[in-house]
């Protein structure tokens, strides 16, 4: 079967995983990254069993699993610590035969970069995307995030980043809390997960941009260990960003028979379901598999197969995450909490 060449725009999780999958299929691959170096902030990615299956098919499952921790025993709580419900992690584990896992972003990126290097894929840093026509590649993959230049070139401004009206903070505490899950208040919430021994991943969402001291005050009366996390971690290591998603949903993840989008470039979502990295990995593996099955001579058919497999699924996840965000940040917490209590144990 005739093999071809691909250029991947963006060296994030989705872009590197796509490059690995295409290279393992025998394609010549280059990765362009506009930044001069990759950021190494230490937030955690949750990986659902389906995403772990995709990593297995890419030959990366064991390496990632060795750097991850299982996620179990998480609860949804009120600010006073009252448990409202359990997250369905154990149910997912029983059905899938493996637990959801959490891995720090730097550790996941280290695995991907090591495999990219081993496969002989070049990553060209400080290189902006100038459009598909001058690349000389058979396939152009847009993995360049929510502000994707590849997406804009293919679809114009019909879908664009849209703010949801809240601000997120994320960070890593230098101790294990032993208390995991999310705590929901009025218009705001706080989450904690394991990430690696001796550390805890945390994230918070508030209605407006605030400084570090204001954030601490926002959660000062909440149950332990939330105030301690904010008091004992260095604000200079915290990351703040306005929560956005891609709206409206794209009509396709592919364009013109030679361009495909993966990850946030295709379906950027709010982080409430913790599926951003998962969907990017599923996109990457599905695209590489479709291209390998059809070959260079049937690239339009390969992209159509990829779009058929991934678009509806990923867009449903994005919609679910946005809907959950509205529910969690509700201004009527009593009604919301009452509904949560009705969830099965």
Where are the model-predicted features located?
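FAD/FMN-dependent oxidoreductases across multiple families
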Residues: 186-188, 196, 206-273, 279
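N-terminal Rossmann-fold NAD(P) dinucleotide-binding loop
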Residues: 15-16
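Flavin-dependent oxidoreductases
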Residues: 164-193
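Glycine-rich FAD pyrophosphate-binding loop
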Residues: 23-43
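Conserved N-terminal helical subregion
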Residues: 2-6, 48-155, 159-172, 209-218
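C-terminal helical "tail/cap" subdomain of flavin- and related membrane-associated enzymes
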Residues: 1-4, 81, 228, 251, ...
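Residue-level marker for buried hydrophobic side chains located in beta-strands
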Residues: 29-30, 140, 259-262
